Amino acid sequence: MSLEISGSKLIKAQIIDAPECSGVYKMLDVNKQVIYIGKAKILKKRLTNYIKSDLDNKTLRMISNTYFLEYIITNSEVEALLLEAQLIKKFQPKFNILLKDDKSFPFIKLSLDHDFPQLIKYRGKALSDGKFFGPFASNTQVNTTLTELQKIFKLRSCTDNYFNSRTRPCLQYEIKRCYAPCVGKINKEDYRELVMQVKDFLQCRTIALQANLSKKMQELSSQMRFEEAAEIRDRIKALSYVQLKSGILDVVRDADIIAIVHKNLHYCIEVSLYRAGQPYGAIPYFFSSTENSTHEEVLEYFLLQFYQKQQVPSEIIMNHEINSKENMIEAIKKINNISDLSITVPHKGGKAKLVQKAEVNALLSLEQYLKKSIKNTDIMFALKKLFDLPEIPERIEIYDNSHLQGMFAVGVMVVAGQIGFDKKEYRVFSLSSRSLTIGSEIELRDDRKGDDYGMLRQVLTRRFTRLKNEPHKLPSLMIIDGGKGHLTIVKEVMDKFEINIPFVCMSKGRDRNAGLEQLHMQGKEVLTLDKNLPIMKYLQILRDEAHNFAIKNHRLGRSRAIKISSLDEIDGIGETRKTALLHYFGSYKAVCNATIDELTKVKGISKSLASMIFNILNRKISLDNS
């Protein structure tokens, strides 16, 4: 419904015709962008709450920005819960409580589609081609576990292509992390036995596993195979040590322990993961709320968003009750197509102790978060004042580029906010050299600046094109690595897209010395700040993060291009010889490290051709390291 009124007047007008049933409502701003999505058991009653006199500032600001109000009737509260979750995920409204870090947790994957299964880290949906163990709360935990497993069981971690190309054992074999099945150092039966042992260990069948290993050790000893028996003995010791460190629990098997705490309108929800009785780590999530927000409301929003992405255990154990628990259970079960789930809030016993531990950890995490947030808030106030921004910046985008005389050019966007860098929002733009200097109305003084201007134009054009579909990611401030000329480019592209975002260009001073940075703004004199000011140090940190990210991705692109093209560019190296080289040495890197004499051992490679390969590849390596 579209009216010429807005805010509370619009809501009052809508209440008259609002249905008295369950459903979902959407609030839209003057540009018809969704700014809030809510659900209600009775829509009419829920909308009435928005015309009360005791609303907090955030809710009042949301209502004042509402120019359109839409609602969708549902058949049940569960259906309303599901629809609300889907719409929040789709529109990411700025006034909703959003789960910003929604990346999936890593797993350990044991492949099942190969005679010699690999043991690797995996992130994504569980597929049918493997056995999955986890989830783990962090990359550190999954990597540590994998390292321990490789030391104990020595299963391969290489790709199938790498496995098939081996003619001799790799470094993993030399450091006793792999049995080198690729070159026949272990047979299928013995390897399969190791695979079963890994499964038993990860499924916490450790007592039976250790009993079987002890029995095998005795058999090997009686057969005078002492070296093999000693290896089994070491495996038993290592398993006992790892088991002691992880601390297997009898209280829970497959469960997520969720504790919510709050302070000063900030919430922390800490999720501790337990699978097969083992702790798989914990991760905190932080939210800002309104004065009228409740634990129940924040928890409900979190649960629906969290379990759209993450694996659901058989039990969710929390420190706080929620409204309509049964509806929440049904909604999560439908989202994930599962049949078994319980949500409990224990008050005594072993589970209650686990919840209390999670609550203590959540409070510590929140304290650390708030200390960091206070420092950043002071900086944000300083930025608002320095650049005359309409409000405290919530999203800052920093841009830079990197290239080698125009080749392998990349532009990057780094994102920062009140809680630091938001690395999942970083973007890399691979740049085409064809349009670097086309269409510029600026008089260019040299080719390097021409490239920089063209690169910036490309990056901003692509960024603003995408921004049309992501209005919730509109930056409060843009910082561009560049000088006065870059101001014109930014303004030119903004005018083209009819976008008005505060921006500043930041350049190094004379002799490009750090600490003498100059800030360039539209219609203002060049500004130089004292290098010891906290705000100047913060701007340098932002600039350096973008600069380092640009260089890193430029080098990656350059290295990737060299690896793909180097062998193909050598006269006399066709597909047959290229395959022979890679098969003999096992990898492109090994070919690069080979001597001329080693190269001649490959079938079809003469002395003169080996010299040519050696010289060209080493020249490329020198370029890549420059």
From Swiss-Prot:
This is UvrABC system protein C. It comes from the Bacteria. Its main location: cytoplasm. The keyword DNA repair applies. It is found in: Cytoplasm. GO terms for biological process: nucleotide-excision repair; SOS response. PANTHER family: UVRABC SYSTEM PROTEIN C (PTHR30562:SF1), UVRC/OXIDOREDUCTASE (PTHR30562). It holds the Pfam family UvrC_RNaseH_dom. It comes from Rickettsia prowazekii (strain Madrid E). One of its GO terms (cellular component) is cytoplasm. One of its GO terms (molecular function) is DNA binding. Belongs to the UvrC family. The keyword DNA damage applies. PROSITE patterns: GIY_YIG (PS50164), UVR (PS50151), UVRC (PS50165). The UvrABC repair system catalyzes the recognition and processing of DNA lesions. UvrC both incises the 5' and 3' sides of the lesion. The N-terminal half is responsible for the 3' incision and the C-terminal half is responsible for the 5' incision.
